[in-house]
Amino acid sequence: MKQVCKVRVAKLVNLETGPISRKKEPLVDFVIHGQSARRMAGPVMLIIRDGWGINPGGKDKRKENGDATLLASTPFHDELYRDYPGSKLSASGSDVGLPEGQMGNSEVGHLNLGAGRIVYQDLTRINKAIEEGELTRNRVLQETFASARGHRLHLIGLVSDGGVHSHYSHMIALANAAHDAGVAEIFVHAFTDGRDTSPTGGAAYLKTCETELKKSGGQIVTVVGRYFSMDRDRRWDRTKKAWDAIVLGRGEICKSSPSAAVEQQYKNGKTDEFMPPLIFSHANEQRVHDGDVVLFFNFRADRARQLSQAFLLKDFDGFDREVWPQVHFVTLTQYDVTYSSPFIFAPEELADILGEIVSAAGKRQLRIAETEKYAHVTYFFNGGIEKPFPDEDRRLIPSPKVATYDLEPEMSAFEVIDEVLARMANYDLIILNFANPDMVGHTGVIEAGVKAVETVDKCMARIIPKLLELDGKAIVTADHGNCEKMRNADGSPNTAHTSNLVHFIYVANDAARFRCEDGILADVAPTLLFLLGLPQPKKMTGHNLLVPV
């Protein structure tokens, strides 16, 4: 039975121009739950406030937790939270295809948001392969070790248990498997984290690896911070420092163990993310030679590509490599479909995802973000597909060129919004990401985190009133938590993601007709399909979270 839509006009305020005068929403027929819903002319928008979680400590512990979302002045968010239906979503652990208790991240979050189902992540798949002995039976890995016999095997990647880009246990498993396969020389080039983990947790991870590597005879020969080795914004001067350390043995020569050397760097004021290149063996000489095998054990692609290109591309022009060893280059997962290098774990193919369905229906969609999150609203949101769907437009706004985003917490949010406002009326679906809460949250600088949150709130105050004037609808959510916990219990900065829940707020002229159920990130795509008046495919196992009242 059809239900007729009634209109609720909230007293929504634009912080720049004052109260918004909105025309009434035309009455439309709306068929609830499992049936078609006729959408109005305005766009449907998914607004992802990246890294904006809900700290269970609330206002009482906002200073103790360094909760930038509650320390900030957010009058527009407060109004949305008060006047529109909302609920909470789980964005971590098994609810997003990660191991139980594992914090979420942007790649995982956007995969689940776009797929409309729980997407079992590479971390989970690789852990399972190691536990069940499948890793050592992998054909690509066996061929890799065969190539490494008589040469050096170089294991490069992020050494931490952050689980966002890698897990150090995977490196240990690869080293053990290589030893069992007859590989004699195993060099580990370790990237320290400090972003998805504690800023000074790296020494402990290295200490564990030093012990675990004794079985395989592997040795840590390089340590360098991810700031240099995992840049993704074409800051090639950073990548060159990592290349020079790994390939040419250039850096600070250390006589102590890697863990002890890193501890000393802490005393000198350095932290893991910004760890300068440290060299422990074969200093100031070419260490990667023709015929060697280089295995990049990060499972997430975006921050592994620049260094990979330096190894792979003949016409590479990011920096002067000085030498280009002809190596057998292998990656744990597929980093890019254009790369010729083999990979150990093939990507999981996802069908009937949100972008595909919207495109097949002949609707126009816009994906927009600044550089830091552009891959997430495109490649990851589309299930690992690089090519846009038909009628899917993409707009990239360059992120500011600063060393760390606490120096410019506004990032490029205002430029993003200018672009959205100019294009909004031309699309049926808009996927928008605000990078600030996550990227500034990673710095651990609370004052900057507060400014980042306030920046996003000001942007929301510009975009939502315009959307409502167009009779559009918005879902406001996040991909994971971060900036709601920027201080640890001991008072030290917290730079990692959290496992906290995230907001789910429905903003529309008809919002009073609905309540929002709690759910998981996989429920967002089915809800958007409902708002677009499109049927939900069987492969989308999430649920529409809007329930009529």
Protein language model features and the residues they cover:
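Cationic, low-complexity basic patches in intrinsically disordered or flexible, solvent-exposed regions
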Residues: Q3, L12
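Feature captures the catalytic ectodomains and active-site-proximal regions of enzymes
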Residues: V7, G18, E25-V549
